């Protein structure tokens, strides 16, 4: 295993530049002015270094399927679900694995090393779950992949779905998912939530439920999730994804709910790409923004993180697996442009997501696994503004990706000038 010395790094929360000595796959020493005989010295010249990004919400079974068999012309969640049902006819394990592996590589090149994907566990042959379990094993040297057993067709809409969910957990999924707001009735939605908690308790698994992903101010299954979490003592292990309906809740109810979520130590995942594109399609004007109450949740100390959700699939036609791009989008449409909030955006794709995924040994600290990224930026603000490339991605002490940034040369007034979109002393 190689030894690496990272020189002149700007660590988050530190004013002075520092060095990081990597040996035997861990951070052996961190501090200024380090000098060791090593296999490689990387002088990052003041660039921002960070723990790797964590993408806490993906659907790797559906990635790269946009337009197959048809495009989502309405842009709605429901049409996306219908297209996925059509796509499943004849979908092979080989296609799922190829597409998932490609997007995982995109994620790594963009600085992600810890991913959580939902896998369609109600697909009757088990092909989807088996494919992603194989990918998890095949890609383990590159990424840590958590798999959620996700009931794409709900749990109580057809007989046999409960058995399929349990089988997915027996096969080795890491978390149990749910879809209560899409069940046939509110009563079945509550049964959905309780079933998920029961199954998670049985297998000692985490929970990540697609919850209230609509604009209905009466869709309040997240409240049931908070109750079950508190009653069962599962604080910190439960995640509610989306919760876009919270945007439209009565403010008095939202105030009470946020108190429950804090007591339950719930993790919340917002998915800026899909939420901004899919939600409020029937609003007309004025049109709501279609995201959960990110600012209020953060202000109350609730753990909120960002997921990519969909990448070129029936629900969202764009994307390249970049958590930093998701953070930049959320800054705009959740109005998180205050200077301290920009740092929070980076937290939402690093330490907050790591907390959601219950990761251990995460972060730039002596003794931790040497997992880190070097961004082509000098500050968190510029990382968001520029949506910076990852110059280096280091996994267990090995450089697994190197990026050479684009070089732009402007020719004007008889001179050549390099353009990098950064401020200089003359701008101040």
Residue ranges, per PLM feature:
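Active-site gating loops and adjacent loop-to-helix segments of metal-dependent hydrolytic enzymes
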Residues: 64-96, 172-175, 221-239, 262-267, ...
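Alpha-helical scaffold segments that flank or form the walls of functional sites
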Residues: 66-118, 126-138, 163-170
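Active-site mouth loops of central-metabolism enzymes
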Residues: 83-98, 148-159, 180-187
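His/Asp/Glu-enriched, well-ordered alpha-helical/loop segment
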Residues: 206, 227-238, 274, 278, ...
